[in-house]
């Protein structure tokens, strides 16, 4: 059951990771209007077992052998009183999609995501990952000879509970950013560093 909590906030179980699936598929729907203009093929995968070893992403990335991969997941919103922002960072519900930076993230993909967000006036937050993430990005970037990988997160309160809370503005921003990022890619892009 989905409950409306305010104008743009909703509570439900399993936003992790239904929200990410929605964002990817909606971005693909919007991109399909521009498919004649795209310089490459866009492929989407809804993976399984991300929470228990990222097995679905591992096999999918190996089979597809992409040049660029973008994992879309949720990120812990830390905007509640008992959360230590110094330890967990400051991610706010309703303040935009989270663009992660860290050891699994290709810096050129990160920069392109930020450029896309700024070009389209899409609100975003930066998530700092000090070690490999527990997301599909962790294994996508290691597939075959390596994949230039980015990670987007939808801020989510009360993750892994029956009462997760998400903001529709963050979800819409994620959709727009995926579509804008994908539309900006060219076959000639070099993501090596």
Which residues does each PLM region occupy?
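Active-site loop ensemble at the mouth of alpha/beta enzyme cores that anchors a bound cofactor
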Residues: 66, 83-96
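Alpha-helical metal-binding/catalytic segments enriched in His/Glu/Asp
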Residues: 7-51, 177-181
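Active-site-adjacent substrate-binding region
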Residues: 91-175, 180-193
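Short glycine/serine/threonine-rich phosphate/pyrophosphate-binding segments
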Residues: 18-21, 52-56, 134-137, 161
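Acidic-glycine-rich active-site phosphate/pyrophosphate-binding loop
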Residues: 1-4, 84-85, 148-153
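Glycine-rich phosphate- or other oxyanion-binding loops that anchor nucleotides, phosphorylated ligands
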Residues: 1-3, 12, 49-56, 117-120
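A glycine-rich helix N-cap at a beta->alpha junction
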Residues: 60-79
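Acidic, glycine-rich active-site loops and adjacent beta-strand->loop/helix elements
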Residues: 2, 42-52, 74-76, 131, ...
